[in-house]
Structures are given as C-alpha cells and as structure tokens.
From Swiss-Prot:
Subunit structure: Part of the 50S ribosomal subunit; part of the 5S rRNA/L5/L18/L25 subcomplex. Contacts the 5S rRNA and the P site tRNA. Forms a bridge to the 30S subunit in the 70S ribosome.
PANTHER family in the record: 60S RIBOSOMAL PROTEIN L11-RELATED
Organism the protein comes from: Pseudomonas paraeruginosa (strain DSM 24068 / PA7)
Gene Ontology CC: ribonucleoprotein complex; ribosome
Function: This is one of the proteins that bind and probably mediate the attachment of the 5S RNA into the large ribosomal subunit, where it forms part of the central protuberance. In the 70S ribosome it contacts protein S13 of the 30S subunit (bridge B1b), connecting the 2 subunits; this bridge is implicated in subunit movement. Contacts the P site tRNA; the 5S rRNA and some of its associated proteins might help stabilize positioning of ribosome-bound tRNAs.
Origin organism lineage: Bacteria, Pseudomonadati, Pseudomonadota, Gammaproteobacteria, Pseudomonadales
Protein name: Large ribosomal subunit protein uL5
NCBIfam families reported in the protein's UniProt record: PRK00010.1 (NF000585)
BP GO terms, sorted: translation
This protein's UniProt keywords: Ribonucleoprotein, Ribosomal protein, RNA-binding, rRNA-binding, tRNA-binding
Length: 179
C-alpha cells in the first residue's frame, strides 16, 4: 500500500472527521483522482513534440498518457479538427498516492523561487488545480535528454463538497499553501 494512503487512513481521516464534525468516516473528503494535462499548441506541425511529451508524462507518472485531439477547427490558433494538441493522464488509487507523495516531498521543493501554492485555486466544489512551469522538477526527467521545457496542469479531484473541506484535506496532506 502507498505510504500516503496509509497515512490518510490511519491519521488524516480520523482527524478530519473530528475537525469537520462528520458523523461517518465515509463522509470524510478524499482524493479520488489526479489528472495531469500537457497542452501542446506548438505541436500542430510536428509529430515529434507529441511523442516527446508522451514519453515525459509516462516517465513522470509511470502510466501511458493518451493524446488529446482538437474538437473544433480554430483559424486563430491555426488548428484543424482532429489534430493532436495535447496529452493527458489520469491517476487513481495507489499510483495516485505515490505520485502525490513524490510531488509533495521531491518535486515541489525543486521548483525555483517556490513560495508556496496558491490557496485560492479551488473550483468551488473542493477540487484543486495547479500548474507547473517546467517538467524538469520531476526527478524522473533527465535534464540533458529533453527537447524543450514544457509546463503541465495538475488537477486533484476530491469528494469534498466545499472549498473549505478540500482545503482542510490538502492541508492535512501537508500541502505547502502560501497563506
């Protein structure tokens, strides 16, 4: 079992149940999935960019990402319907907890000029989104073998009903929020 999953079950869930004054342990908010998305607008003319992004995301997550395609043609962005424009991967269960553990303990401390995560990046339903400017903060990526610095979006989907419940859950996981 993943280290963070065990910590959640033994320490975080009972503490949150008391803190949020919930009647049942099944009401306690939990992280259900983590979605990593890499938007590749520059990949319009080059298939190699997509292949490199897939390889990077696969190294980071240990899971094969899927390529996302444009749903509509947009002349302003010079894209056609059906062209590949990004890659994404959804992590659940043990892989999700292992990724979260690596993100919090290894990757975020490696971010240059890191002052903490924005505590206001919740969506109103307890889900949290954050962006990473460069993929080299992950130790799985070899700096010498990357072709370009690419950012990615990380979305944590939780069962929390409100932002405050979601914030309490992520604080219990020791998320480094700014304020």
């Amino acid at each position: 079992m993943a280290r963070l999953k065990e910590i959640y079950r033994k320490e975080i869930a009972p503490k949150l149940k008391e803190e949020l004054q919930l009647a049942n342990v099944m009401e306690v908010p939990r992280v259900t999935k983590i979605t990593l998305n890499m938007g590749l607008g520059e990949a319009v003319g080059d298939k190699k960019i997509i292949e490199n992004a897939v390889a990077d995301l696969e190294k980071i997550t240990g899971q094969k990402p899927i390529v996302t395609y444009a749903r509509k043609s947009i002349a302003g962005f010079k894209i056609r319907e059906g062209w590949p424009i990004g890659v994404k991967v959804t992590l659940r269960s043990d892989r999700m907890y292992e990724f979260l553990d690596r993100l919090l303990s290894i990757s975020l401390p490696r971010v240059r000029d890191f002052r903490g995560l924005n505590a206001k990046s919740f969506d109103g339903r307890g889900n949290y989104s954050m962006g990473v400017k460069e993929q080299i903060i992950f130790p799985e990526i070899d700096y010498d073998k990357i072709d370009a610095l690419r950012g990615l979006d990380i979305t944590l989907t939780t069962t929390a009903r409100t932002d405050d419940e979601g914030r309490a859950l992520l604080r219990a996981f020791k998320f480094p929020f700014r304020n």
